[in-house]
Amino acid sequence: MALNQLSLSLQFARDAEATAHRATLPRHAVARWIRHALAVDAEITVRIVGAEEGQRLNREFRHKDYATNVLTFDYQQEPVAVADLVLCAPVVEREAREQNKTLEEHYAHLLVHGTLHAQGWDHETSEQDAQEMEAYETAILQELGFADPYAA
């Protein structure tokens, strides 16, 4: 299977919570996970942040006053997808622990999830859209050697 081209910028905020995850997110792995979710070529910035920045961005752009796991800012979907994916390290770590997953597994899932959002996928419009997106995420992650992220 030929994968689409990816121009990737990987950033870690100057925050102890974010930089602690640097070893879990080698550039080659992040690029591989994202490329498997791409239907078009892409220019994507991935930024790993701490709780404070995550909460501020979620409040500012989604009007929700808490840090969330991943925020996708999609600027263009065609002919090249252009987006920023912001992942909040302490939220990802807490969720991974609660779901009995490794950090790597959860980051892979959230990066695939965010990449699909960057290409127009949406799980909040209808139950059918949510099911289709979850099924596609699961297929991509299984291709990458990860378990179904939605399995109980």
UniProtKB/Swiss-Prot annotation:
Q: What does this protein do?
A: Single strand-specific metallo-endoribonuclease involved in late-stage 70S ribosome quality control and in maturation of the 3' terminus of the 16S rRNA.
Name-wise, this protein is Endoribonuclease YbeY
Per the UniProt record, the source organism is Acidovorax sp. (strain JS42)
- What broad class of enzyme is this? hydrolase
Please give the PROSITE patterns that the UniProt record associates with this protein.
UPF0054
Sorted keywords for this record are:
Cytoplasm, Endonuclease, Hydrolase, Metal-binding, Nuclease, Ribosome biogenesis, rRNA processing, Zinc
Disulphide connectivity of cysteines? none
Gene Ontology cellular-component terms for this entry are: cytoplasm
State the superkingdom: Bacteria
InterPro entries assigned: MetalPrtase_cat_dom_sf_prd (IPR023091), YbeY (IPR002036), YbeY_CS (IPR020549)
Q: Which family does it belong to?
A: Belongs to the endoribonuclease YbeY family.
Biological processes per GO annotation: rRNA processing
Q: What is its main location?
A: cytoplasm
The UniProt record gives the binding positions of Zn(2+) as: 113, 117, 123
Q: Which GO terms describe its molecular function?
A: metalloendopeptidase activity; RNA endonuclease activity; zinc ion binding
Return the cofactor note field: Binds 1 zinc ion.
Q: Where in the cell is it found?
A: Cytoplasm
- Tell me its cofactors: Zn(2+)
Its EC number(s):
3.1.-.-
List, alphabetically, the Pfam families matched. YbeY
